[in-house]
Amino acid sequence: MASLADGGKRRVSYFYEPMIGDYYYGVNQPTKPQRIRVTHNLILSYNLHRHMEINHPDLADASDFEKFHSLEYINFLKSVTPETVTDPHPSVSENLKRFNVDVDWDGPVFHNLFDYCRAYAGGSISAAAKLNRQEADIAINWAGGMHHVKKDKASGFGYVNDVVLAILELLKSFKRVLYIEIGFPHGDEVEEAFKDTDRVMTVSFHKVGDTGDISDYGEGKGQYYSLNAPLKDGLDDFSLRGLFIPVIHRAMEIYEPEVIVLQCGADSLAGDPFGTFNLSIKGHGDCLQYVRSFNVPLMILGGGGYTLPNVARCWCYETAIAVGEQLDNDLPGNDYMKYFRPDYKLHILPTNRQNLNTRLDIITMRETLLAQLSLVMHAPSVPFQDTPSSSQATEAAEVDMEKRNDPRI
């Protein structure tokens, strides 16, 4: 295994849709696509674009979405507008409730909603296709990572599940996909989509909640291929590192994934208004650094994060990790300097929030997850069980998967 200090160069392909920052969830909505534009501007200011390939993603279309989502739901997303939601006809309110759109505060209807879905999901699907063609070692889409969306319901500020769609794309060429996430909430719908297959292993480090219990470990052929680390308030860098490194190290040894998807939700950072963890940007980035060190094809996605300047800081820093560059803590001049007042620094300090995860908690959870991994078949071989029926993967794609050569790593 490569060391944590691995700074070798990788072929990095970065996907960015220039219009992404124009989409607006509405007044008092915490999710702001503008954060992607600010992140991008900071990346340019640090000259990181000189170390990677910049791509405009292909916009996804309805046929892409239907590989996971229901046709009725996608047709609804195509037609709903801020004007139509005010229609008094009972069918309108029924559909809004049915598809969980404009019902709760985390699924508002806004102008050009479907185009927004096409943009952020297109970035993730394009990134997956880039890895499939072996044209990059690392592919990045910070606009992606909407891991809560169900087959026929919006959820968690997302409307289509680009993570599931990207993994389905990767399964056309790669035998085994390891999905890891380090955001604050559990990646419930990614786990749900692949809980009964051995072709995808999911590992989630998240706040303890209604889903993602440590006893939830998959079903059928996917039994033991879902790993969950439900953590308490105040999680700090040291505690996460003590859990993340041994668990991921063992997962890599046992499962031998051919490609990794890392969801880097920034709502696990200290000070996030909806998160109660206490991670620094460096501690968050250390997880990416460790995953990168294995030199396995890697997709990096965004996710949650509701303190805009800290999200931009974090994802810019992690872009630097991806390309193998170190950044000065003093921010360079950029178009959004006002967001970074008063210190204009890259890194943030943890708060004084108490870490409720005791040393014994971390040790116990680590040993439980390592014991679960001992029950996983070592590097399951093709033929695998079929990709979940929700993917509607084509027969041709499965044939391609069987015929492919081992990926370049």
From Swiss-Prot:
Binds 1 zinc ion per subunit. It is found in: Nucleus. Zn(2+) binds at residue 267. Its main location: nucleus. It is an enzyme of class 3 (hydrolase). Its EC number is 3.5.1.98. The keyword Nucleus applies. Residues 384-394 have a biased composition (Polar residues). Low expression in flowers. The record marks 306 as: Polarizes the scissile carbonyl of the substrate. Residues 400-409 have a biased composition (Basic and acidic residues). Keywords: Chromatin regulator, Hydrolase, Metal-binding, Nucleus, Repressor, Transcription, Transcription regulation, Zinc. The active site is at residue 148. Belongs to the histone deacetylase family. HD type 1 subfamily. Responsible for the deacetylation of lysine residues on the N-terminal part of the core histones (H2A, H2B, H3 and H4). Histone deacetylation gives a tag for epigenetic repression and plays an important role in transcriptional regulation, cell cycle progression and developmental events. May be involved in flowering induction. Histone deacetylases act via the formation of large multiprotein complexes. This is Histone deacetylase 7. It comes from Arabidopsis thaliana.
